[in-house]
Each structure stands twice: as structure tokens, then as C-alpha cells.
Amino acid sequence: MTPPPRPAIVIAATPTPNGDLHVGHMAGPYLAGDVYSRYLRGTGRPVVYTTCTDDSQTYVVATAHRQGITPEELVSRSTAKIERSLAAMGTVMTGLPPIDDRYRRTVLDYVTELHAAGRFKLRTVRLPYARNAGVFLFDGLVSGTCPVCMAGSCGGACETCGHPNNFDELLDPKYTVDPTDVVVYREQTILVLPMEDYRERLTAYYASRTPRWRPHAKQLIGELLARPLPEIPVTFPSTWGIAAPFPETAGQILYPWIEAMPASIYATWW
């Protein structure tokens, strides 16, 4: 007897619950994932098409501040809007899984195992800091100029060229919540994932896949591999997010993008 085909897993980009989906969101990852899922199902392949909201993003904090509400309230409102928009578009996505204790346990189990295996390294880094507000700036809390393409960019990665900018690399940083606040730099010891340790494996992985990719994505990977690979933050001195479980970074949170892989795992079985 022939076994049933293995289900395909299609995971759309995780939407940030700092507002409803706009046309660019809908026409981009969610419609594309829906079309691909329908195609696979049309060929007889079972499909799990899913995603989940990335509640820990700093964009939630910045937007909530502008609207005069709490981040928790913004997440609740926005998640409901996102679910309605996905349903109104007629996607075959089964729904958004709840970001609850099961989700947090999945994330913590994932990072704890990597930590125990010695994958993370302690680094003392220089971080932008809003002096009057008393907060460290990263991702959606900081804006400035991309050091690679010189376009306007938030922290973490440039949406124009795709290159990362970590720690103190963003030029002319401003606090997005209050651009008049004075930005200084302070050192903090955090955990990072040193991607350079995995260069050989990453190079082999992308060499086998980028020939099928679109030109812009293929070029970006080539540019990234031609440079020293970044050290991805694992923890960060902040308050909004999942508390880091590691004794050497007490009082810090897990960097939101470290949740991405366990979030994808969680979204497939909830």
C-alpha cells in the first residue's frame, strides 16, 4: 500500500500585530502563500498553510505609544483585525494560533536547548540608548540611515537593500517614539548567535537553493556571504517580550527575531 504523500508546510511571514494588514501585505506573502497552497492541494498534496503573529516586536511598543494604549491592548485589537482580513480575502489558512503559555513554552524549550548545546556566545556590545526615556534602542524603536545603501532604515535590517544592521551600525540613530530625545551609546553584555561559525553549512545550503530563486533574493544572499556574517542577538536589555531564561543575562528579554523558528514550529501543530 502506497503511503499518503507527506504534507507540505507553507508558512507565511509572521504579521506584526501593530495594526491591520495593508494591501502590500495581502498582495505579498499571504496571497502568494495561499495561491501556492491551493496549487499543491490541486495536485493532491496535503498542505498545512499557517503563520502566527509576532507579538514581541518593538513595532508594537512604538505604535501603542503613539496611540496612547498599552502594547497588550494593541496586540489584541490588531490580531482580531488581521484574522478578519485573512478570512475576508478567502485564504485557506486555518487561523492564527494563540500566543499563549504553550507558545512561550515552545520558544523557551527551543532556546534553552540551543543554550545548553553551547550555540550562544556572550558578547559585550555598544547599543544606542535614549537618554531621557531610559531605554535601549533596537528594531522598531530606532531609525536612522542604513550603513550599506544609505537609505532610511529602522534597526535590525534595512527594508530597502535587505542588509542587517546590528547594535551601533545604524547611522544617525533616532528614538522613533521621541526623535528629540538624545541618543547616546552604552555597553551591555548580551548573548548572540555567531553566524560566522556556520558559514560552511550556510554556503552549501544556499548553493543548492539559490539557483531557483528570484534574482534580487539570490543577489542579496551572495552579498551577505561575501561579507563577515553578523552576530544575531539572542537576548536584549528590554522589557516587552519573553523573559530570557539564562542566568548570565538576567533581566533581559529574548530578541524578538529569535522567536521566528520556534514560532514556525508552533504554528504547524497548535
Predicted regions and their residues:
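Structured secondary-structure scaffolds
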Residues: 2-32, 37-43, 48-51, 105-106, ...
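N-terminal catalytic cores of NTP/NDP-binding nucleotidyl/phosphoryl-transfer enzymes
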Residues: 2-78, 95-117, 126, 133, ...
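Short, solvent-exposed loop/turn and secondary-structure capping segments
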Residues: 23, 60-62, 151, 159-160, ...
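A glycine-rich helix N-cap at a beta->alpha junction
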Residues: 78-94
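Generic secondary-structure signature for well-ordered alpha-helical cores
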Residues: 87, 116-119, 163, 207
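Residue-level signal for inorganic ion chemistry
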Residues: 114, 158, 259
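Cys/His-rich short segments
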Residues: 118-191
